[in-house]
Amino acid sequence: MASPSRQPPLGGSGLLHGSRARSYGSLVQSSCSPVRERRLEHQLEPGDTLAGLALKYGVTMEQIKRTNRLYTNDSIFLKKTLYIPILSEPRDLFNGLDSEEENDGEEEVRPSKDEIGSSSGRRKNRGSGSGRPNGTGLPPHQETSTPSHDLSASDFLKKLDSQISLSKKAAAQKLRKGESGVPEEDTGLYPSSPRMQQRAVLGPVPLTRTSRTQTLRDQEDEIFKL
């Protein structure tokens, strides 16, 4: 009996099938994920160190060694230049396509000046037409008064000055009324005595010179003479 033909297993790997064996080395790059690393060439100078280069470019010393295939005991001055691995952002891998799309999206979102003007005109028409049917208008004092947010700087300052002047006038009138009312209140609260009324009628009392005051003056003169 003839043995059935052997069929090769599906997905088998080996040298006969010509498929590449999967390796897990550090230098093998996966074809599924995009390359996110670019290399920067650095010219070595006499004062350069591996730690200084790692600190300068923001990478680790192991990354520099792996990129340049240096062992731990090797000196960096065996080569004239070193390649510094720098991680690139995923946005840089698309050659600026994402940035163009984002700019287009921002331009679509931003409204134009004409649209802004038309929308403001519609709002004004709605505000004037709503709430006043049959062509009835606003009262004159409401029509002339402008909203506070529409006032300019000069109008606001003029309004402030007028309020200050009005408050000053009111304070001055209040003080005048208070001064004119004080004597009336005093006369009503404190009745004048008959002696004060007599002084008010006769005027001030003249000073009289008595004999006692004369003798005192003479004694003072004698003391000064001595």
Swiss-Prot record:
Any Pfam family matching the protein: LysM
Query: Bias category Polar residues: which stretches?
Result: 142-151
Example of a GO cellular component annotation carried by this entry: nucleoplasm
Kindly indicate whether the keyword Phosphoprotein belongs to this entry: yes
Could you tell me which residues belong to the region Disordered?
95-156, 170-226
Specify residue ranges for compositional bias: Acidic residues.
98-107
Cross-referenced InterPro entries, in alphabetical order? LYSM1-4 (IPR045030), LysM_dom (IPR018392), LysM_dom_sf (IPR036779)
The family database entries (PROSITE patterns) matched by this protein are listed as: LYSM
In the record, which positions carry Phosphoserine? Answer: S23, S33, S99, S165, S180, S193, S211
**Residues forming coiled coils:** none
Segments of skewed composition (Basic and acidic residues): 215-226
- The superkingdom of the source organism is Eukaryota
Entry keywords, A to Z: Phosphoprotein
Which N-terminal residues, if any, form the signal peptide?
none
Using the record's annotation, list all stretches that form the LysM domain. 40-84
Q: What is this protein called?
A: LysM and putative peptidoglycan-binding domain-containing protein 1
Species:
Mus musculus (Mouse)
